[in-house]
Amino acid sequence: MSPQTETKASVGFKAGVKEYKLTYYTPEYQTKDTDILAAFRVTPQPGVPPEEAGAAVAAESSTGTWTTVWTDGLTSLDRYKGRCYRIERVVGEKDQYIAYVAYPLDLFEEGSVTNMFTSIVGNVFGFKALRALRLEDLRIPPAYVKTFQGPPHGIQVERDKLNKYGRPLLGCTIKPKLGLSAKNYGRAVYECLRGGLDFTKDDENVNSQPFMRWRDRFLFCAEALYKAQAETGEIKGHYLNATAGTCEEMIKRAVFARELGVPIVMHDYLTGGFTANTSLAHYCRDNGLLLHIHRAMHAVIDRQKNHGIHFRVLAKALRMSGGDHIHSGTVVGKLEGERDITLGFVDLLRDDFVEQDRSRGIYFTQDWVSLPGVLPVASGGIHVWHMPALTEIFGDDSVLQFGGGTLGHPWGNPPGAVANRVALEACVKARNEGRDLAQEGNEIIREACKWSPELAAACEVWKEIVFNFAAVDVLDK
């Protein structure tokens, strides 16, 4: 019998139910560089102390169960258990607390976002002692980061592949998202790329439906982008959505895209799942394909302030699982996105090292070591009048994607693309000359309208379109 087993046997087994805080609330614990750290927003049921609630989260997301079990004596709980090491009250909220939990790295399989989430956000979110629970942030230690491939290529490699520098990239989601035939779909792709866009995009729910099978769409879109490349002298791309009902079918579609010689494919990473996404990211790295990621279903998970998973966590998970682009909100468009919060997770997507900054919702310092960055994609209800704000908010390393803001142009798709390209070039030029895009944005666009009738027409159509709704998910004040 080993000394470890002898020690545990000597303690003896006492059946029954213990309060979680007796084992899992350890305010004296000093976190290790190798721990995964989590910040949970906890809303306990009436009568449940915050220490017990925080300890319950640590227990149920690591080694604990509802009662003492004799097999606890066969392992080292002190080595493997999660620990709630700090609790702080949320200012301005009744009965809400931030519980900080540390997890030993040995609890997680290397290179598996799936396993990490199965532990940290598995059964614990249905725990009866909690009225609500939200995972606000994770600190991923470098030791765990290094077990992931991450994005297939990253920002610099993508720019080198496309030979495009010094400005944001421009995209367009083809509309209507459902119902077009493959040939008409390809026509819209060609017209937008020919007009000056860098990318066009399948919408998230375009897979392989009766009105347009995936193989037909891939063929017509490849023809469209090659024709646009020949006529413009610029490298073009279309995000061919490879998302499918099985991983095998998804990879088959990615293989066909590679055989066509296109530069980029797409995946819906939340509905498709992290295992499928990581598999596709590895295929894209090995075969020179860029990977665009759509976040369909994210608001089901992240929009409510007191329950779910914050998008900054989903963004970190995507960087680990793999993707070269991901939709990140616009701040100014039709979709949810508060400015400081959005800029916080945009930095977490792009930068190598991000300091803790609670003013932007960042609970932990994050060191990504050598993991490539991800381009944030601003998309959803944006048009030419938003271009100065988008350029100022997101900077050069971003993709600005106008669907209705291109295809809704009164003169057609090519002039819609021209209007967006002219507006972007005008904003970049003004910024490089030292002008303030936030203060002078409208004036910059009006000046550009004088030498671009396409832009002038777009400005007239969308001059009164705004989306003035308060964000649901805002920072604690």
Swiss-Prot record:
Report the residues modified as N-acetylproline: 3
**Location of the protein in the cell:** Plastid, Chloroplast
Q: Which residues carry this modification: N6-carboxylysine?
A: 201
**InterPro entries listed in its UniProt record:** RuBisCO, RuBisCo_large_chain_AS, RuBisCO_lsu_C, RuBisCO_lsu_C_sf, RuBisCO_lsu_fd_N, RuBisCO_lsu_N_sf, RuBisCO_lsuI
Sites where the protein binds Mg(2+):
201, 203-204
Annotated source species: Atropa belladonna (Belladonna)
A Pfam family this chain is assigned to: RuBisCO_large
Q: What else is known?
A: The basic functional RuBisCO is composed of a large chain homodimer in a 'head-to-tail' conformation. In form I RuBisCO this homodimer is arranged in a barrel-like tetramer with the small subunits forming a tetrameric 'cap' on each end of the 'barrel'.
* Residues that make up the propeptide removed upon maturation: 1-2
This chain belongs to the protein called Ribulose bisphosphate carboxylase large chain
